[in-house]
């Protein structure tokens, strides 16, 4: 079958003490570290938890990355996150529009930059990916070719690959590594493995 069924379970109940422990751990982060805030917030936690985390880290040299949607994403922009990663559908959803072309996606990515995001990484399904870096330079990467087996975790893999690639300081290489990592997960039964990532990099 070519159909894919995704089951999303309800998150655990997280109490106030666990949240307090989280913030104590945040104080152990050092300059140059990266923290990724991804997905939805459990219903037992305050809805502004992401905002509080970014406010807590404000003024420190820590890369804050947010992979979320709707108000969870929009409300953190005032804290100038280092990177946000909506897909093209989520980007359009923020502004109540449907985006199709690279130029449309770039235009709305720039709006997010104007609202505070330093770097905007947009996954565009079969169109590949677009990165608007903090120098306002737009980078576009095509999509890898292969047989889709599993799309679950592809966005997370792309983000992980991008951040790993960014250790070299080159946005273009980081975008390619992220694209290959996302593709490697999509074309496998599980998560991306290095050999498959390296193979797909040759396509980009």
How should each PLM-predicted stretch be described?
Residues 1-34, 200-204:
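Conserved N-terminal subdomain of the carbohydrate kinase-like
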Residues 12-15, 41-45, 72-74, 128-129, ...:
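Short, small-residue-enriched loops and turns at beta-alpha junctions
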Residues 7-10, 37-38, 67, 123:
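Short beta-strand segments
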Residues 16-17, 93-99, 148-152:
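Short, charged, surface-exposed secondary-structure boundary motifs
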């Amino acid at each position: 079958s070519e159909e894919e069924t995704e089951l999303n379970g309800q998150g655990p109940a997280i109490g106030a003490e666990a949240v307090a422990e989280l913030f104590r751990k945040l104080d152990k982060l050092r300059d140059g570290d990266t923290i990724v805030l991804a997905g939805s917030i459990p219903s037992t936690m305050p809805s502004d938890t992401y905002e509080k985390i970014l406010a807590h880290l404000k003024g420190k040299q820590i890369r804050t990355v947010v992979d979320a949607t709707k108000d969870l994403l929009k409300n953190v922009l005032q804290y100038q996150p280092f990177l946000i990663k909506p897909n093209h559908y989520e980007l359009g959803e923020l502004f109540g529009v449907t985006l199709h072309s690279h130029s449309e996606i770039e235009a709305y990515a720039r709006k997010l930059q104007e609202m505070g995001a330093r770097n905007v990484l947009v996954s565009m399904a079969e169109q590949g990916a677009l990165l608007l870096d903090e120098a306002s330079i737009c980078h576009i990467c095509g999509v890898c070719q292969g047989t889709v087996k599993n799309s679950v975790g592809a966005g997370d893999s792309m983000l992980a690959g991008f951040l790993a690639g960014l250790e070299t300081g080159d946005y273009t290489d980081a975008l390619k590594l992220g694209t290959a990592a996302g593709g490697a997960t999509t074309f496998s039964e599980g998560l991306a493995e290095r050999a498959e990532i390296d193979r797909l990099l040759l396509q980009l």
